[in-house]
């Protein structure tokens, strides 16, 4: 493996009536996604895949990054395709599955840095560097809470093989 990393920003600009969604204003969500995407484009050198599951295309303002091969948009209509009682986590898993199947950048990488697309991970370069030099053989890097027995999926680093299960 060549230790190639790609940042995968997961997005649902129009959540519709998804349960447990506190921010439903599509315009605000769109601005937050655009701001975060701009942050990663300016603060990192990694290729970025923006995977959006409500069929909303925001690629127009980022054309120069697409044209130079730094950014890939994968947009599909997936938010209506599952039982909403399964929740946002299930929808996010479907986004990653779709990216595995349809993204050229993901196909070419060794590791995915999955970040919830509205968030700006200020230490993203340090996190990737830590993984690259300290944990390159680790299947997954994520914030884990042993007391609660859950993993925070807002950010994780993993090889593609882990996600294929």
What is each residue range found by the language model?
Residues 1-165:
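ER/Golgi luminal nucleotide-sugar-dependent glycosyltransferases, focusing on the catalytic module
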């Amino acid at each position: 493996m060549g230790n190639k990393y790609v940042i995968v920003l997961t997005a649902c600009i129009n959540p519709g009536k998804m349960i447990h969604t506190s921010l439903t204003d599509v315009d605000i969500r769109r601005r937050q996604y655009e701001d975060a995407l701009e942050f990663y484009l300016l603060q990192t050198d990694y290729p970025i895949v923006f995977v959006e599951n409500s069929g909303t295309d925001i690629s127009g303002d980022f054309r120069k990054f697409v044209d130079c091969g730094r950014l890939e948009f994968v947009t599909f209509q997936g938010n209506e395709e599952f039982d909403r009682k399964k929740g946002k986590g299930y929808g996010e898993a479907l986004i990653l599955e779709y990216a595995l199947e349809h993204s050229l950048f993901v196909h070419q990488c060794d590791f995915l840095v999955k970040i919830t697309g509205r968030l700006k991970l200020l230490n993203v370069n340090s996190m990737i560097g830590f993984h690259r030099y300290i944990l390159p053989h680790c299947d997954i890097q994520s914030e884990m809470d042993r007391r609660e027995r859950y993993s925070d999926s807002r950010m994780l680093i993993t090889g593609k093989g882990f996600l294929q299960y």
